[in-house]
Regions:
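Immunoglobulin-superfamily
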Residues: 1-111
């Protein structure tokens, strides 16, 4: 069988996101940082669904930062559509496994 190289290690989350309360139209950041080798890829999920970022759509108002954090250029929140409010987790993966962060809720403050 193939032996693991000494340096390779499964992901672990070293910075978890925390709950946020933000105003509509304001920027916001959910932090996430993971370690591992090879460097884990980071994806965000909200309510079990993968969050689309600028990596999926260059016009997206959500950006995946190099650190793994999720940055909202502005929080989108309307009567009918509330795409940003919810409970988020970040998932770090490499070929050795995956690590899931704590839940963080993003709440939009009512004016």
């Amino acid at each position: 069988g193939s032996r693991l190289r000494q340096e390779d290690s499964p992901p672990r989350i070293v910075e978890h996101p925390s709950d946020l309360i933000v105003s509509k139209g304001e920027p916001a950041t959910l932090n996430c940082k993971a370690e591992g080798r090879p460097t884990p890829t980071i994806e965000w999920y909200k309510g079990g669904e993968r969050v689309e970022t600028d990596k999926d759509d260059p016009r997206s108002h959500r950006m995946l930062l190099p650190s793994g954090s999720l940055f909202f250029l502005r929080i989108v929140h309307g009567r009918k559509s509330r795409p940003d409010e919810g409970v988020y987790v970040c998932v770090a993966r490499n070929y050795l496994g995956e690590a899931v962060s704590h839940n963080a809720s993003l709440e939009v403050a009512s004016k």
